[in-house]
Amino acid sequence: MKFIKAKGIVLKDVNFEESSKILTIFTSELGKIQALSKNCRRTLSPLGAVSQPLIYSEFVFTKTKEIYSISSASVIESFFDITQNVDLTIYSSYLIELVDSFIQIEQKNEDILRLLLNSLYMLKKGADPETVCRIFEIKMLIFTGFFPQFTQCVKCQKSNLSRIFFSFKNAGVVCAECKEENDMEISLEVVEKILIIAATDLKKLSKIRISKNLNNVLKTLMTTYIKLVLQKDVKILDFFKFIK
């Protein structure tokens, strides 16, 4: 029997049979996979600790035609403490849902895995969660190839715009002459902040600061655009109204 090693974070868990779980795990080596964690719900199971969302571990898998099975695993980093705070649970669930929605089974994207781990680490260390989410949204769009055009009008290619509008339909900014009825006017400050985040290395993202007013605009812009890209609602957004 062949053993396969991979490092990954559990995105979701679903109870299976009497004492097991089916885990959705995002790994660097195998991409997003589903794996059986057999008997992990038993009290003394050695797989219990690694079979929960927000746990980053090194796994050893075996594979049948149908599914991976976890042979053994050891925790590298636990973000489970985040779930002790209701607000942070909602924020982290949002990040997880975006990853799970953008990444297909067996699709690899190490940039997004690093982004997710970095973002969860920032939440764990007390970074402003709204800022973490805005950064995550922008970087996610870059790493998946859906980042909009912000440097010139997507229709006429004019740059240095006096007034800037965002076209959700055309995935980028448009000038006053090219704008349509439902396009959203945004300030130069919004565009500049997006481009700064886009150009900043993951290791330096903790230095980014976003004011409350700017965050509100970015949140509307990014969440609306992401829902259009995914062609579905992001369910966890409904829970943001409960955040204090």
Swiss-Prot record:
Involved in DNA repair and RecF pathway recombination. GO terms for cellular component: bacterial nucleoid. Belongs to the RecO family. NCBIfam families: reco. GO terms for biological process: DNA recombination; double-strand break repair. This is DNA repair protein RecO. Keywords: DNA damage, DNA recombination, DNA repair. It holds the Pfam family RecO_N. The keyword Signal does not apply. Signal peptide: none annotated. It comes from the Bacteria. PANTHER family: DNA REPAIR PROTEIN RECO. InterPro entries: ARFGAP/RecO (IPR037278), DNA_rep/recomb_RecO_N (IPR022572), NA-bd_OB-fold (IPR012340), RecO (IPR003717), RecO_C (IPR042242). The keyword DNA repair applies.
